[in-house]
């Protein structure tokens, strides 16, 4: 019996654990501190800084099963998903890594043992082919002489992409930096399937399938293109779980493995589909994986960046459900089956199941309102189409008005053999982006581009001032040896008490000083293992190697500590009051306020906000000690410590505890005891995205300031109402009741005045061919009273045509009334349209009553004067 996908995943990790590798958990799909990546798309992403030498781990061998998404930017597989055997938006990448430990020999031997040993995957050796980089003789000889693969199944691949080292078998992290040759392992499905070996003209067939890529990072590519050997070569490998599962389960398509068969059956059940070969089932089965795990990792549907990619995937799935005949919301119902089929890899998702389901359901309901109208519009446009290409402007209008991502439009068009002018769509999108950029004035921070090779030791938990040495200086992102007074720069020290922004806590401010210089620090940021002090040299000069005294702004740090500790208390309180589905989705902790984004599907009730406040203040009054302990990550999680959204943790973590009330992983700075916080007050609660709420709160002196401000406002209101704060509510109720009574009396007076005005107006009506015509401009009459006056006049005059107008704040209001017996000859809508056009407006209504507005008050007299002639012509 073949292994299940879950068993294959576990076997891979167990094998490499037996070879001395640290099993490292999958990192978030949202890359930590890497602006170059939209989503995690490879196993090595979380180790990128280790390979670059900017980060160090307490292990030199690692193995992972990394969750990945490829559905935006460079790696965009979305349009092919569901229509090919191996394209997915979400996949798991099995990998083993060596950080300056073993190299080619062991990497190849490990791979061969896992794939062919009877104890592990037991693949037939004669079915395996390998490729190596053309000049990588070392790898070639290991495969041939040590492993024993015949020469005819070892293929050298040269530079096949038009440049030196541009090859399918040469891997590069970027234009510069670590790179090296790779060897790939292929599985031959047999001659009953079309396709040729890698490097042959038929290589795109499905017979030979790549199952493992092993990268040997042995060079550092320089800006001039030269390759320098790395002092400690490393290994990065990747094997798609779905691909190897297909091989081990003896199927040719990833969608036929046990995991997808189970999901496809679940999709059929919730949509009512009966044909299990329908491609839409495959699309939805794939998309629920990416959508559920993206939401669990903190991405919410929106119209920008990662949120927009998520929205595109959800809407594509919903549209395919619509094609299958789904009559109600269905997508969210697949989260449960997904958790079941993922096994141990779905534990994080299971903890957030309710939240993920609610976000998916809300998004589907919102899109369902526009899906039908959008599809109808698309059908109309396609019916009018004379050629085979839908223009980009129409595709953009569908996106802009109905929320149709262009790939969804392309899906519909592809089913009818119609192309989409994607260049035209992109031009319209770029124009919209240009307008948005001009409106926002957003610009990139050059400091984010700094690369620092040195490391800084943070000593700010125990010190607010200490002596350090300048190890690097940067101006405009470039390393310099010295700076002078007036220059803005980033200063890196060997050790520092300054906290660099992390975990939502802002960076410290303060001063770096010496006998002849003073550098004002306005912010502190991390650059790999270095801590950069960002600011301006106020006086003197500063150079690399200088000794400095680093002084943190103590008062500011103290306020930040209170706010950060209060954030932990509030997080725990929210989970008690609202439920354990609450998890942090983002935060900001500075010296003035704390801001906390969390998962919750509705606005908090006032009484819930009060209970959270009371809970936090109760812990403050308990004056609990705030304790920190360093422990293994897994031990901390077992203890129940909550992790911060988006943070990356080492194997040894800092655990912060406040009695039995709160335990979290945190590297930030905190108060010594909860009592130091003094007072906690929530000042606002609002929504930021579907399923995400935001609380802003203040502590200590800031909270006391808000209490005083509230008291001052109450006193001012009490003074205005000639009362005191003790009976203020009664006073306000009394004023409101009196106001309602006066408004009622005023309305009655207005109606009486209108009735009197109507009586006066009736005498001004003239006879036009047996019909009474009344045309008048009224002053001092509210526009909303015109309708009442027309009704009164129609009752008084019998067969009649009435046009009334008034001007308020430069705007013209018009109304026309026609008695029923005259509407066969004169229609109020046509009449009011004729008048409105002359005063720069438009309007309409029923044959017997119509209203309009206009902007040209000066033209009103002439417009009203034209009514008699127009009516006379109609009544002849």
Swiss-Prot record:
Coiled coil: none annotated. CDD domains: AlaRS_core (cd00673). GO terms for molecular function: alanine-tRNA ligase activity; aminoacyl-tRNA deacylase activity; ATP binding; tRNA binding; zinc ion binding. Homotetramer. SMART domains: tRNA_SAD. Keywords: Acetylation, Aminoacyl-tRNA synthetase, ATP-binding, Cytoplasm, Ligase, Metal-binding, Nucleotide-binding, Protein biosynthesis, RNA-binding, tRNA-binding, Zinc. It is found in: Cytoplasm. Catalyzes the attachment of alanine to tRNA(Ala) in a two-step reaction: alanine is first activated by ATP to form Ala-AMP and then transferred to the acceptor end of tRNA(Ala). Also edits incorrectly charged Ser-tRNA(Ala) and Gly-tRNA(Ala) via its editing domain. This is Alanine--tRNA ligase. Its main location: cytoplasm. SUPFAM superfamilies: Class II aaRS and biotin synthetases, Putative anticodon-binding domain of alanyl-tRNA synthetase (AlaRS), ThrRS/AlaRS common domain, Translation proteins. GO terms for cellular component: cytosol. It comes from the Bacteria.
């Amino acid at each position: 019996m073949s292994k299940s996908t879950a068993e294959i995943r576990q076997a891979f990790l167990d094998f490499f654990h037996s070879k001395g590798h640290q099993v490292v958990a999958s990192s978030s799909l949202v890359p930590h501190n890497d602006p170059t990546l939209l989503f995690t798309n490879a196993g090595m992403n979380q180790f990128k800084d280790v390979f670059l030498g900017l980060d160090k781990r307490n292990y030199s061998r690692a193995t992972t099963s990394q969750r990945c998404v490829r559905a935006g930017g460079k790696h965009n597989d979305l349009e092919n998903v569901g229509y090919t055997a191996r394209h997915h938006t979400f996949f798991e990448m099995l990998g083993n890594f060596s950080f300056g430990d073993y190299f080619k020999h062991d990497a190849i031997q490990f791979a061969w043992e896992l794939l062919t040993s009877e104890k592990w995957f037991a693949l037939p050796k004669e079915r395996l082919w390998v490729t190596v980089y053309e000049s990588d003789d070392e790898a070639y000889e290991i495969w041939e002489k040590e492993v024993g693969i015949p020469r005819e199944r070892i293929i050298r691949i040269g530079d096949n992409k038009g440049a030196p080292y541009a090859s399918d078998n040469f891997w590069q992290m970027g234009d510069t930096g670590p790179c090296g040759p790779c060897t790939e392992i292929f599985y031959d499905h047999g001659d009953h399937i079309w396709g040729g070996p890698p490097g042959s003209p038929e290589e795109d067939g499905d017979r030979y399938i790549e199952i493992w890529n092993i990268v040997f990072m042995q060079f550092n590519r320089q800006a001039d293109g030269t390759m320098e050997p790395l002092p400690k070569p490393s290994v990065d490998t990747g094997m798609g779980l779905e691909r190897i599962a297909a091989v081990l389960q003896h199927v040719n398509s990833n969608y036929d493995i046990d995991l997808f068969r189970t999901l496809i059956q679940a999709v059929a059940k919730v949509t009512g589909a009966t044909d299990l070969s329908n491609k839409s089932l495959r699309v939805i089965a794939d998309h629920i994986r990416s959508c559920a795990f993206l939401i669990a990792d903190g991405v919410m549907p929106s119209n920008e960046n990662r949120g927009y990619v998520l929205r595109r995937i959800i809407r594509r799935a919903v549209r395919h459900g619509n094609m299958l005949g789904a009559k109600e919301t269905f997508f969210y119902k697949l989260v449960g089956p997904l958790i079941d089929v993922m096994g141990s890899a779905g534990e994080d998702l299971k903890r957030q199941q309710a939240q993920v389901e609610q976000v998916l359901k809300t998004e589907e309901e919102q899109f369902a309102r526009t899906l039908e109208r959008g599809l109808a519009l698309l059908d109309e446009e396609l019916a009018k189409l004379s050629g085979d290409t839908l223009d980009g402007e129409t595709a953009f209008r569908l996106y802009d008005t109905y929320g149709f991502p262009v790939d969804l439009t392309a899906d519909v068009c592809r089913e009818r053999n119609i192309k989409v002018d994607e260049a035209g769509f992109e031009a319209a999108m770029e124009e919209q982006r240009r307008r948005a950029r001009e409106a926002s004035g957003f610009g990139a921070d050059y400091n984010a581009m700094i690369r620092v090779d040195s490391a800084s030791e943070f000593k700010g938990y125990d010190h607010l001032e200490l002596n350090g040495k300048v190890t690097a200086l940067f101006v405009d992102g470039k390393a310099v040896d010295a700076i002078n007074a007036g220059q803005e720069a980033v200063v890196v020290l060997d050790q520092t008490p300054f906290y660099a922004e992390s975990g939502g806590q802002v960076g410290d401010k303060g001063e770096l000083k010496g006998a002849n210089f003073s550098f004002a620090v306005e912010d502190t940021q991390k650059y790999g293992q270095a801590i950069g002090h960002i600011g301006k040299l106020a006086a003197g000069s500063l150079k690399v190697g200088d000794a400095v005294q680093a002084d943190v702004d103590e008062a500011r740090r103290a306020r930040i500590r209170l706010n950060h500790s209060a954030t932990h208390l509030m997080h725990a309180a929210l989970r008690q009051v609202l439920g354990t589905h609450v998890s942090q989705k983002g935060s900001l902790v500075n010296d003035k306020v704390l801001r906390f984004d969390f998962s919750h599907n509705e606005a908090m009730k006032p009484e819930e906000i009060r209970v959270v406040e009371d809970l936090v203040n109760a812990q403050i009054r308990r004056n609990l000690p705030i304790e920190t302990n360093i422990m293994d990550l897994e031990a901390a999680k077992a203890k129940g410590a909550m992790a911060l959204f988006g943070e990356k943790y080492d194997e040894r973590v800092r655990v912060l505890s406040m009695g039995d009330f709160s335990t979290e992983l945190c590297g930030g700075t905190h108060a010594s005891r909860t009592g130091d916080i003094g007072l906690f007050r929530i000042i606002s609660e609002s929504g930021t995205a579907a399923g995400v709420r935001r609380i802003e709160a203040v502590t200590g002196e800031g909270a006391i300031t808000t209490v005083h401000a509230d008291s001052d406002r109450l006193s001012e209101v009490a003074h205005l109402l000639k009362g005191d704060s003790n009976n203020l509510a009664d006073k306000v109720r009394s004023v409101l009741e009196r106001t309602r009574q006066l408004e009622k009396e005023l309305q009655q007076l207005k109606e009486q005045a209108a009735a009197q005005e109507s009586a006066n107006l009736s005498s001004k009506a003239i006879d036009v061919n047996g019909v009474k015509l009344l045309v008048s401009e009224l002053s001092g009459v509210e526009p909303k009273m015109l309708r009442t006056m027309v009704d009164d006049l129609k009752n008084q005059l019998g067969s009649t045509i009435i046009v009334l107008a008034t001007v308020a704040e430069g705007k013209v209001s018009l109304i026309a009334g026609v008695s029923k017996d005259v509407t066969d000859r004169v229609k109020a809508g046509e009449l009011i349209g004729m008048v409105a056009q002359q005063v720069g407006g438009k309007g309409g209504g029923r044959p017997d009553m119509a209203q309009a507005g206009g902007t040209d008050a000066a033209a009103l007299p002439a417009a009203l004067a034209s009514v008699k002639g127009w009516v006379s012509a109609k009544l002849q």
